[in-house]
């Protein structure tokens, strides 16, 4: 299949080693961040925050978060261009949704008169409340929707990436306490350009299950 979307997805892969001399341009970074902002979410809740690790000081903090576990991902932090933390809200309140609906009014998606009726969608949030009054089991998957959007955007931009679930959420919440207040982070994304001779994964063929093994058409 020659469609450009398929070309993007056939060529993207998980980078295993980065070239520290190459940085993502501010123009391309702006495209990625706007794509993240435009990502889909349940009831348009947008229960997330995307924290961009760019400076050397921020990278050192991120590097230090691997002190206790998942050290195999630690080398990416200083070698890649940027790291993005995909953070999801622990609790999602009516006030949070009011911000979303007020923006929808400002954007002329709904009228002020329709706003209260639109709050009916918040019932879905209440159905996903745990015994501690938190909604993280529901907000966490929303962050992964944004992650998928980011991966395809990066493929289109010819920027390499490494999805990292091998992080330490507890230590991250301590090191980035101010930035993650009210949020948790279970996945991060390293972005940049792979090392031309030391990224073994760059030259390996793509391997996915056969179409008929994963697609059922009724």
Swiss-Prot record:
Domain of life assignment: Bacteria
Pfam families named among the record's database cross-references: Nitroreductase
Binding positions for FMN per the UniProt entry: 12-16, 73, 165-166, 206-208
UniProt xrefs under Gene3D superfamilies: NADH Oxidase
Keyword Transmembrane helix: no
Stored CDD domains: NfsB-like
GO biological process terms held by the UniProt record: bioluminescence
Cofactor section: FMN
Keywords: FAD, Flavoprotein, FMN, Luminescence, NAD, NADP, Oxidoreductase
GO molecular function, one term: oxidoreductase activity
Matches recorded under InterPro entries: NfsB-like, Nitroreductase, Nitroreductase-like
EC number(s) given by UniProt: 1.6.99.-
Chain residues that bind NAD(+): 154-159
Sequence similarity: Belongs to the nitroreductase family.
Role, per record: Involved in bioluminescence. It is a good supplier of reduced flavin mononucleotide (FMNH2) to the bioluminescence reaction. Major FMN reductase. It is capable of using both NADH and NADPH as electron donors. As electron acceptor, FMN is the most effective, FAD is considerably effective, and riboflavin is the least effective.
Subunit text: Homodimer.
Protein name in UniProt: Major NAD(P)H-flavin oxidoreductase
Source organism per UniProt: Aliivibrio fischeri (Vibrio fischeri)
Lineage of producing organism: Bacteria, Pseudomonadati, Pseudomonadota, Gammaproteobacteria, Vibrionales
